[in-house]
Each structure stands twice: as C-alpha cells, then as structure tokens.
Amino acid sequence: MAVRQALGRGLQLGRALLLRFTAKPGPTYGWGRPERPGPAAGWGRGERPGQAAGPGAEPRRLGLGLPGRYRFFRQSVAGLAARLQRQFVGRPRGGAGPCGRAVFLAFGLGLGLIEEKQAEGRRAASACEEIQAVFTQKNKLLPDPLDARRWQGFRLEEYLIGKSIGKGCSAAVYEATMPVLPQNQQVAGSIGLLPGRGPEIIPRGEEEQAPLAPAFPLAIKMMWNISAGSSSEAIFSTMSQELVPASRVALAGEYGAVAHRRSKGGPKQLAAHPNVIRVFRAFTSSVPLLPGALLDYPDVLPPRLHPEGLGHGRTLFLVMKNYSCTLRQYLHGNSPSPRLATVMTLQLLEGVAHLVQQGVAHRDLKSDNVLVEPDADGCPWLVITDFGCCLADERVGLQLPFTSWYVDRGGNGCLMAPEVSTACPGPRAVIDYSKADAWAVGALAYEIFGLPNPFYGQGRARLESRSYQEAQLPALPESVPPEARQLVRSLLQRDASKRPSARVAANLLHLSLWGERTLALKDLKPDKMIGWLLQQSAATLLANRLAEKNCVETRMKMLFLANLEYEALSQAALLLCSWRAAL
C-alpha cells in the first residue's frame, strides 16, 4: 500500500512538472486562462504545494520537526527542481522529449518516496510529544520534607543538629532534623539544644547517645567563609553557585530580598530533577562550634571559636535531604552486577543531560559528589550534588570565554575533559562544556563497573586527560554488556565532536536495557519504534500504579518517556544498531 501511494504521488507530481515546464512560455497557457502555479512551481522553489509564494507571503521552513536527514533530502531535491526548471524553461517549445519526461517521472517518484518518509517522521515525532506530555505530569519528584512548614526552617536555631556526615574542601555536612513533636523536644532538651535557644557551642560527644537520638531526615551543609565577608549580600554573591539547585521556597527567607535585588545575568536556577540534589532551605547564620569542628577544620573557624581561625563569623547554611552515603562509599562496600552498574551509569547520564538542557555544567563530577539512596529492594538511586564549581551563567551558557589563565576552568583536574584541560587562552578562545560532564561520566563508569578509575592514582597506569590516547584506555570486564563497553569508550573520545551527547548516550542505554527485541529487527522503522514506545508506556504506567513504591527501573523508564525526543532517539537507535552490527 505504501509503494502504491508513493507511485501515485510520484505520477501526480511528474504530470504536474511536465505540464508546467513543457507549456508555451507566456502569461497564459492552455485555454487562455491565467497561469496558476501548480504543485511543481512550489517544488521548484522549495515550497509546499498550496503554499503562497510572493512578496507578501511568509517563508516557511520545510520539514519542521523532522529528522535532519529528511530535511537534507528535501532541500537537495528542491535545489534539483530549481535547476531543472531553469534548464527546461530556457528551451524552445517542445524541447522536452521522451528522455525529459522520463527524468521528470523519476524525479516525481523520488519526491513521492520522500513524502512517505516525511509522513513517517511526522507521525513518530507527534507520538513522542504525546508520550512526553503524559509522563512529564506523572514523573513526580520526591516530597519536600519541609513543604508543610513553608515559612519555617530559615534559622539555624530551628534545627537539631546531629553527628558529622562528612567534609570537603569548602564545607562540612551534618545530619539534622526539625523538632516538632514533644518527644523530639525532650531529646533536644537533654543535649541542650531546644529550638529557639540556639547555643553557640554544642558539647562534643553528646551526639553519641544513639538510643535517644531521633531520625535525621535532613542534612545541613555549613560553608567555610574565608573571604566572603559577613554580610548576607556578600555571602550570596560569593557562594551563589551553591544555590543553583535551590528551590524557590529555599530563597524565600532573608535570601529572598537579596536574590530579588541581584542584577540580571547571575547564576541560573536549576529546574528540579530526580537525579540532581535539591536545596530546601538556604540562609546565613553565625558560625557555631559543631561536633568535631576543633579537630576536623579548626583553621576555618572564626577567631571567637578558635584563636588561630581565619574564618568570618557568619556563613551560608544549606538544608538538603540526608542520603545514605556517597557513591564512593557505596562502591567500597558493594559490587553491583553488570546490569545494575549499567542502570547506575544511566542515572548519571540522565542527570547530566538535564544539566545540559538547562545550560549548566557541573565541572566537578566525581564519586564523592554523587549521593546514593537505596530503594525498597536495595537498588541504588544516584543524585548529583555539590555545585560549588558549576558553570551556570545566563550570559555565557555552556560556552565560557577563555581570555586569560585567570579564568576558572572548573574543580576536578583529574576528571577534566580534554577540550577543557588542553584549552589555551586567547582573545576569541572559548571552552565548550556541552559534553565535558558526559566525559566525566565515562571515567566514573570504570569505578561503577568495578575497576580503578584510569585517571586517578600514580605511576604509569594513571592517564592524564591532557595527553592520553584512546588506545590506552583499559578494557572493561567481559561481563559488562557490549553496548555499555562501547558507550564508555565513546564517551571518553578526545574529540568532543565525535563524542555522543549525554541525551543520546542516555537514550542508547535505555534502548539497550528495555528495547532488546525491537532493536533486534533488521528493518527498524519509525512505526515499529513508536509501537514499542506505546507498549512501554502502558507497561510503565501500570507498574507505577500497582507498586506501592517505585523501583529504580520503573523510575528510569518514566524518566526516559518523559524526555522523549524523536531526533535524539533516532540517533541513539542508529548508533546502537551500528555497534551491534559490528560485533
């Protein structure tokens, strides 16, 4: 049926072309009626049939929303039509013989086939948009534990702070909760920390009373303030990158006024995503002497707490969800299976794809900056955190002008993409970060699949992003799926133009994990792909409705369907099929 329609369409267009170009030149033809531009006239100028062409007509792009390869064919054929029109119109009347008619017939047949391809592309793109709209509404984030107390939580005195979770080069993190129940207030009073009292010094060792301690669903990150001054506006200006993943409610306290007064072109506000940390509250307060401070970070304390301290008396506090551990800690005690490790890598790619879509580059991806929360079945859910080194400037996007060596290129030098680490400053030099975080995910994949990170360590085994060659990359274990092995090598290509984007890489793993039967077909067409997507949509909606708690794989399928783009999906499918054909 499709071939019959294509032939019919081709004959119709060929007949129109013959009538158009073999007629007598002049203002009229045929029975003396004014010339009406038929379909061929529009094709000769690259227009759709029936589209007005004239000085007052608005131009319309061909193949809008269709894959690039179809638009290329359409534009190429339109150019060929224009050349043929010039060639045959310039001939005397009757100059078009049987050969010319055959050329036009073949030309019209080609147009009919391309029209059929375009119709398939339009149907596929429309179906992807409809599926995306459904799952964008269904794909809900984790609930905000402070949502019921919208105007609370903007003072340090309102929190009960527990033991230290960890510290980095610029902050310390503590577990915390907001006591509201009577039993929690009794526990808070037993260690001398009732809401509203706000003691500056918390006795060390009291947090070890585990039997009395309540659950700590929150984590408070206390930034170390060495050079930002003590005013809220100065702290906000210096540490604004930490607020990129903050919700709007997080800035409703004292920072609301400061954020309102800030000039345009500052750091972006990142939209929420399940694989990206969310800051629930952000506020400034006096620096307290928290448990272990004198041993872990005495030099950054203010002089009133430590005579040799260099810190200011006021700093920034960020309230977030308390996760079980970091990715480094999780991998130290667990060895995920190859399939689970592939799903973990996929989660990082989903988070990075969201950052790129929002115009944000993390620039400090490492296993210490990825948090892990196991689901009910013990499967890890990964969340990207610590945006202190991110690039989130509305003025430059992901293209950072690199005019001098004083421009900050990011945080982690070991996992810095080659296009970043080898960049040289100049008047027009620009660093493109659009695929830099995807490269870092490729390096982290070695750790997730159970091997040492090749860009860490010492000696000859360590690779440097500035100078490594792709042939030097160690091979992943044979137990790792071949598609995942090939993807890791592709993500670590030195040439960023040959590297897949995070969105295409994520789609590729989605197809590899869930679309085995569909991609096994030798003749993969858009209609078959859409049929598979509709089946996945129905199954995912049913699983999401029946399960009390979403498992990791169900949540990943919902993310995949909520980010459907036909162009990126087609690229991933073609790339995956080519890899499988080469095996």
Give residue ranges: language-model regions:
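Non-catalytic localization/regulatory regions flanking kinase domains
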Residues: M1-R262, E516-L583
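Conserved C-lobe activation region of Hanks-type protein kinase-like domains
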Residues: L243, V420-S479
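Conserved structural core of kinase catalytic domains
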Residues: A271, R278-N334
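Catalytic-loop of the protein kinase fold
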Residues: V356-P374
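Activation segment/activation loop of eukaryotic-type protein kinase catalytic domains
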Residues: D368-C414, G426
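Conserved C-terminal C-lobe helix
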Residues: S479-Q493
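Terminal C-lobe "cap" of eukaryotic-type protein kinase domains
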Residues: Q493-L519
